Design a protein with these regions (language model features):
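Bacterial Sec-dependent N-terminal signal peptides
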Residues: 1-27
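A short tyrosine-centered beta-strand micro-motif
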Residues: 118-123
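Extended, low-complexity, turn-rich repeat/linker tracts enriched in Gly/Pro/Ser/Thr and Asp/Glu
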Residues: 126-134, 146-148
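Conserved positions within compact, well-structured domain cores
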Residues: 136-144
Length: 238
């Protein structure tokens, strides 16, 4: 009888732990798998449920269900298999001499962050094959209200208050891996009431470290003077 009770309690504890692990992530649609509408072209991140872009130039959504420019694993920017599922997003984080505007991802959290608690952030990124540059400074910004810019352009934070709400990798390394996902990992201590996240590069070009890369022989095409990254499997947990 005692053995059965212990076994029951162990099973219950394991099940509850499993449920907690499944529900820990505060990011809605973290792998961009849930979509609503027809994905037809670039700049359609809004087809992914719960995701959009804060500027007038929209981020991209790629899917194995759509061949060509917006497919996976091959698309207009390179080749990469999804980290999880069938889809991933893509953003431009750097352009040499600011020739092209950046793009960003934004979403509302499942619930507001609690004051004083530390949250662990993980974003998986992969540099596209046709990017001539790789950069650091890929991060996530937390805010109570959505960040907006009613035109094409870069969202640059110059004041300390906004920069303190940007989380990058602790070592803030340059992300230059192609054909392999790297993790942007950081910890954010919440002020409380943060409801939104925005993903991208919030630093100007002179404060962004970059590395110029030779073209990969594994994918045809001409390099562009940009740093374009695929994004997948976004996670924010206590």
């Amino acid at each position: 009888m005692r053995f059965k009770l212990i076994f029951f309690l162990f099973t219950l504890f394991s099940f509850n732990s499993y449920l907690c692990q499944e529900n820990d992530n505060l990011i809605l649609n973290p792998s961009f798998e849930s979509i609503d509408g027809k994905l037809r072209k670039l700049n359609q991140i809004n087809v992914a449920n719960d995701w959009y872009s804060p500027t007038s130039l929209k981020a991209d959504l790629f899917s194995s269900s759509v061949p060509g420019d917006i497919g996976t694993p091959e698309n207009i920017y390179g080749k990469e298999f999804p980290k999880e599922g069938e889809n991933y997003a893509g953003i431009l984080t750097y352009s040499y001499n600011n020739k092209k505007p950046r793009t960003y991802l934004q979403s509302m959290l499942i619930k507001p962050l609690a004051s004083g608690l530390n949250y662990c952030l993980n974003i998986h990124v992969s540099l596209s094959d046709l990017s001539k540059y790789a950069i650091d400074n890929i991060g996530i910004h937390f805010s109570e209200e959505p960040v907006t810019l009613d035109k094409k352009g870069d969202i640059i934070f110059n004041d300390k208050a906004k920069l303190s709400a940007v989380v990058t990798n602790e070592k803030n390394k340059i992300y230059k891996s192609r054909y392999k996902w790297e993790t942007v990992c950081g910890v954010y201590q919440a002020d409380g009431k943060e409801k939104y996240i925005t993903i991208g590069n919030f630093f100007n070009n002179k404060d962004t470290e970059y590395e110029k890369l030779t073209k990969s022989d594994d994918f045809p095409g001409i390099q562009s003077p940009n740093a374009y990254y695929y994004i997948d499997n976004v996670e924010l947990i206590l």
